[in-house]
């Protein structure tokens, strides 16, 4: 029997892509022996180390959705995320699937993912599955490290952008200054996010020339 876990990183940030990753195993106990856990509970160095071991030892599949993809989506962000999970499930063809549900209704999320994927796999869709099941924890690590590397590339291109989250003052400062000086939204930003709309609204009210 094959088992896959699926999780995403970067659903909420205003900058950078959303990454959805899956890990396919035949025995979850091998992952458990590595001490796999939710990526958020690991140091960056430990995540990187486990990422290398996971991607070397097991089959993985990653879906990258850019800010443009996210802004162009039809429907809710939860539906968009379910479609990304479905892409991973379809690619890995597991007998049993563990999902970290992002919908308030975890069962509904699992049903939607299976329907979109066309898979006949058994599914376990739960909140905080990355902290409960090693295979989802492994997927969480792959997704998080992949996104962290994308953010590092963006920092090389744009300079200091912070973490990319709307709550990060460094991210807000970057967006505000970029829009003030360039008169446009950077390609790394999600235009449909309220954070960007608020900055654009302030810019239009004050005039870009004297904005901030």
Swiss-Prot record:
Annotated catalysed reactions: Endonucleolytic cleavage to 5'-phosphomonoester
Pfam family name, one: RNase_HII
Disulfide bonds: none
Cofactor note: Manganese or magnesium. Binds 1 divalent metal ion per monomer in the absence of substrate. May bind a second metal ion after substrate binding.
GO molecular function terms listed in the Swiss-Prot or TrEMBL record: manganese ion binding; RNA binding; RNA-DNA hybrid ribonuclease activity
Gene3D superfamilies tied to this protein: Ribonuclease H-like superfamily/Ribonuclease H, Ribonuclease hii. Domain 2
The keyword Mitochondrion belongs to this UniProt entry's keyword annotation: no
Ligand binding (a divalent metal cation): 7-8, 100
Annotated GO biological process: DNA replication, removal of RNA primer; mismatch repair
EC number: 3.1.26.4
NCBIfam families cross-referenced by the UniProt entry: ribonuclease HII (TIGR00729)
UniProt protein name: Ribonuclease HII
Organism: Methanocorpusculum labreanum (strain ATCC 43576 / DSM 4855 / Z)
Lineage start: Archaea, Methanobacteriati, Methanobacteriota, Stenosarchaea group, Methanomicrobia
């Amino acid at each position: 029997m094959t088992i896959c876990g699926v999780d995403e990183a970067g659903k909420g940030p205003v900058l950078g892509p959303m990454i959805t990753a899956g890990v396919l195993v035949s025995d979850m106990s091998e992952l458990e022996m590595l001490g796999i856990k939710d990526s958020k509970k690991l140091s960056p160095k430990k995540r990187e180390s486990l990422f290398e071991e996971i991607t070397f030892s097991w089959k993985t599949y990653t879906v990258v959705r850019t800010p443009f993809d996210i802004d162009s989506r039809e429907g809710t962000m939860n539906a968009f995320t379910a479609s990304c999970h479905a892409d991973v499930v379809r690619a890995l063809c597991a007998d049993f699937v563990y999902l970290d549900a992002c919908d308030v209704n975890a069962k509904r999320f699992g049903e939607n993912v299976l329907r979109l994927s066309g898979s006949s796999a058994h599914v376990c869709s739960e909140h905080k599955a990355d902290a409960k099941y090693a295979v989802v924890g492994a997927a969480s690590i792959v997704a998080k490290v992949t996104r962290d590397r994308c953010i590092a590339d963006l920092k090389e291109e744009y300079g200091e952008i912070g973490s990319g989250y709307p709550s990060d003052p460094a991210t807000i400062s970057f967006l505000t200054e970029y829009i003030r000086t360039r008169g446009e939204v950077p390609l790394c930003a999600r235009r449909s996010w309220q954070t960007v709309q608020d900055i654009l609204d302030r810019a239009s009210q004050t005039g870009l020339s004297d904005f901030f």
